[in-house]
């Protein structure tokens, strides 16, 4: 059997007092097939059995989840592997460290033995897993880490509302709640809306045109080759219709004439020799005169009547 590897002595983290004797919790030794063949695994177990109970596990069973560790069941965990085992454990190292952190008691220690320079990132991996690195001895190939002492978390139950608490609540009067949002109080005097109306407001307006009767039949218009007499009826109505002539002067008035009178005035204006203009309707008043008409501003005159423009009428 090969000589035993140096093992760091540990102090029991959580001794259980049985009378006056302090009993240590078991230790866990983790090895591999390589360390079992060269005797390192067995030598480590023999050294630890002199002071406490020792449990044994192989690395592949923990990595493959073939077995799990009971929470807070070991005071210390000792790992002895070959350099090739440490190199092949790089991808599954966080998973293994998480299991070991669960299996250790608070302030329990983790001992990594027979390390090489190929695992220089192991201290940082231990810190990320939740361990406190106590000592790192690269020359001796040993790292000791400790599980921190966490304060046990306690759950605080939330108080549920008692059934009687709803009955003790003060009930709100619906009338008071409605009065809070009312725009006026009951003591406010009311205003008669009819008193706000004047006599003019109450006067019924006279419609400017006849009301439209949707049920009344629509009147047809005469066609071009009318032979039913509708064209003659429309022509008679046109002649009997009235036309309003507006005087565009400042004091001008409106005069209502018939269609025949309008046609007579137009014919007379065309026949008048002195009433010369481009439109031929200057005698009708400013409403029928263009912007450059010389008679603009003068009252209407009869066709053929001589109109004299006094220059004294202009304001110089």
Swiss-Prot record:
Residues 209-228 are annotated as: Fe-S binding site A. [4Fe-4S] cluster binds at residues 279, 282, 290, 293. A motif (Cx2C motif 2) lies at residues 290-293. GO terms for molecular function: 2 iron, 2 sulfur cluster binding; 4 iron, 4 sulfur cluster binding; electron transfer activity; metal ion binding. Residues 4-156 are annotated as: N-terminal SAM-like domain. One of its GO terms (cellular component) is mitochondrial intermembrane space. It comes from the Eukaryota. One of its GO terms (biological process) is iron-sulfur cluster assembly. Signal peptide: none annotated. Its cofactor is [2Fe-2S] cluster; [4Fe-4S] cluster. Keywords: 2Fe-2S, 4Fe-4S, Cytoplasm, Iron, Iron-sulfur, Metal-binding, Mitochondrion. Its main location: cytoplasm. A motif (Cx2C motif 1) lies at residues 279-282. Coiled coil: none annotated. Residues 279-293 are annotated as: Fe-S binding site B. InterPro entries: Anamorsin, CIAPIN1, Dre2_N. It is found in: Cytoplasm; Mitochondrion intermembrane space. The C-terminal domain binds 2 Fe-S clusters but is otherwise mostly in an intrinsically disordered conformation. HAMAP family: Anamorsin. PANTHER family: ANAMORSIN (PTHR13273:SF14). Component of the cytosolic iron-sulfur (Fe-S) protein assembly (CIA) machinery required for the maturation of extramitochondrial Fe-S proteins. Part of an electron transfer chain functioning in an early step of cytosolic Fe-S biogenesis, facilitating the de novo assembly of a [4Fe-4S] cluster on the scaffold complex CFD1-NBP35. Electrons are transferred to DRE2 from NADPH via the FAD- and FMN-containing protein TAH18. Belongs to the anamorsin family. Monomer. Interacts with TAH18. Interacts with MIA40. This is Fe-S cluster assembly protein DRE2. It comes from Laccaria bicolor (strain S238N-H82 / ATCC MYA-4686) (Bicoloured deceiver). The gene is DRE2.
């Amino acid at each position: 059997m090969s000589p035993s590897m140096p093992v760091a002595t540990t102090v029991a983290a959580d001794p259980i007092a049985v009378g006056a004797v302090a009993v240590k919790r078991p230790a866990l030794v983790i090895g591999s097939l390589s360390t079992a063949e060269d005797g390192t695994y067995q030598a480590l177990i023999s050294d630890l059995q002199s002071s406490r109970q020792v449990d044994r596990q192989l690395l592949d069973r923990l990595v493959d989840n073939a077995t799990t560790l009971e929470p807070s069941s070991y005071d210390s965990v000792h790992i002895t592997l070959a350099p090739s085992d440490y190199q092949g454990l790089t991808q599954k190292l966080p998973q293994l460290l998480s299991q070991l952190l669960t299996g250790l008691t608070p302030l329990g220690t983790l001992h990594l033995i027979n390390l090489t320079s190929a695992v220089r990132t192991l201290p940082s991996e231990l810190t990320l897993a939740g361990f406190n690195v106590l000592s790192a001895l690269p020359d001796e190939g040993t790292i000791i880490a400790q599980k921190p002492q966490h304060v046990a978390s306690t759950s605080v139950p939330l108080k549920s509302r008692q059934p009687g608490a709803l009955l003790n609540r003060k009930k709100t009067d619906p009338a008071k709640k409605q009065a809070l949002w009312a725009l006026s109080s009951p003591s406010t005097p009311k205003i008669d809306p009819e008193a706000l109306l004047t006599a003019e407001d109450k006067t019924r307006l006279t419609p400017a045109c006849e009301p439209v009767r949707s049920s009344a039949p629509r009147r047809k218009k005469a066609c071009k080759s009318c032979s039913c007499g509708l064209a003659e009826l429309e022509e008679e109505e046109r002649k009997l219709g009235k036309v309003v002539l507006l005087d565009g002067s400042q004091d001008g008035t409106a005069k209502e004439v018939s269609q025949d009178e309008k046609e007579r005035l137009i014919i007379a204006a065309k026949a008048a020799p002195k009433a010369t203009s481009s439109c031929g309707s200057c005698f009708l008043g400013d409403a029928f005169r263009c912007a450059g008409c010389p008679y603009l501003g003068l009252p209407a005159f009869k066709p053929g009547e001589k109109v004299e423009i006094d220059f004294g009428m202009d304001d110089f």
